[in-house]
Amino acid sequence: MVCVLVLAAAAGAVAVFLILRIWVVLRSMDVTPRESLSILVVAGSGGHTTEILRLLGSLSNAYSPRHYVIADTDEMSANKINSFELDRADRDPSNMYTKYYIHRIPRSREVQQSWPSTVFTTLHSMWLSFPLIHRVKPDLVLCNGPGTCVPICVSALLLGILGIKKVIIVYVESICRVETLSMSGKILFHLSDYFIVQWPALKEKYPKSVYLGRIV
C-alpha cells in the first residue's frame, strides 16, 4: 500500500512538473534581440505558397537564413520558392548574400485522403519533422494553413517544452477563410504564439486572434 502511495505521489509530482514546464514555455515570450532571425516557412500547394510568399516579400533581410518546408511531392511550391528568391536577389543585390534552404517532409494528408487515415500519415510526418526542427532550430515558424504545418508547429513547440529552444510560432489564416477557420487553424489556434486572421468576422469569433486587415 505504501509503495502504491509513493508511486502515485511520484507520478503526481512528474505531472505537475510537466504542466508547469509547458505553461512556462507557452507563456514565455522573451526573445533576445539580434541582427538576424532564422525563419522557417511552411509552404503548401496551390494558393498557400502564393500567399506566404507575398507575406515574405514584405519582410526585411533581417529574417535570414530562410528555411522553407514543403511536402515531398510538391514540385510546384519548390519552383515558386526558387523564383521568389531569384527575383528578390535581382531587385536588391544585398539579398544575394542571404541564404535559403528547401526541406521536404511527407504530406500529412493527400488530396481526397480519408480523415481517419490522416492520423497515421500525420504521425509519420511528425516523426520526420522533429529531427528537422531540432537541426535547424529556427527563431520563428511562419505558416498559413497547409496540413504540413501541423507536425512542424507541434515539433517546434516540443523543442521549447524540452528546454532546447523557444520557437515563436506565427500562424496567418488564409485570406480565403472569411467566417470559419481551416482544419489546421482550428488545431493551431491554441498552440501558436500569434494567430492572425484577415477578416473581422473571424476576429469576432476568436477574440484572442490578431486582426490586421488583409495582409496578403
UniProtKB/Swiss-Prot annotation:
InterPro entries, A to Z: Oligosacch_biosynth_Alg14
GO cellular component: cytoplasmic side of endoplasmic reticulum membrane; endoplasmic reticulum membrane; UDP-N-acetylglucosamine transferase complex
Cytoplasmic side: 25-216
Membrane topology according to the record: Single-pass membrane protein
Gene Ontology annotations of biological process type: dolichol-linked oligosaccharide biosynthetic process; protein N-linked glycosylation
This protein's record includes keyword Membrane: yes
Compartments reported by the entry: Endoplasmic reticulum membrane
Transmembrane portions of the chain: 4-24
Keywords linked to the UniProt accession: Congenital myasthenic syndrome, Disease variant, Endoplasmic reticulum, Epilepsy, Intellectual disability, Membrane, Neurodegeneration, Transmembrane, Transmembrane helix
Single Gene Ontology MF annotation: protein-membrane adaptor activity
Main location: endoplasmic reticulum
Domain of life from the UniProt record: Eukaryota
Side of membrane Lumenal, spans: 1-3
Membership in a protein family: Belongs to the ALG14 family.
Disease: Myasthenic syndrome, congenital, 15: A form of congenital myasthenic syndrome, a group of disorders characterized by failure of neuromuscular transmission, including pre-synaptic, synaptic, and post-synaptic disorders that are not of autoimmune origin. Clinical features are easy fatigability and muscle weakness. Intellectual developmental disorder with epilepsy, behavioral abnormalities, and coarse facies: An autosomal recessive neurodevelopmental disorder that manifests in early infancy with infantile spasms and developmental delay. Clinical features include severely impaired intellectual development, epilepsy, autism, hyperactivity and other behavioral problems, and coarse facies. Brain MRI findings may include delayed myelination in the deep parietal lobes.
The protein's role, per its UniProt record: Part of the UDP-N-acetylglucosamine transferase complex that operates in the biosynthetic pathway of dolichol-linked oligosaccharides, the glycan precursors employed in protein asparagine (N)-glycosylation. The assembly of dolichol-linked oligosaccharides begins on the cytosolic side of the endoplasmic reticulum membrane and finishes in its lumen. The sequential addition of sugars to dolichol pyrophosphate produces dolichol-linked oligosaccharides containing fourteen sugars, including two GlcNAcs, nine mannoses and three glucoses.
Quaternary state and interactors: Forms with ALG13 the active heterodimeric UDP-N-acetylglucosamine transferase complex.
Protein name (Swiss-Prot/TrEMBL): UDP-N-acetylglucosamine transferase subunit ALG14
Native organism: Homo sapiens
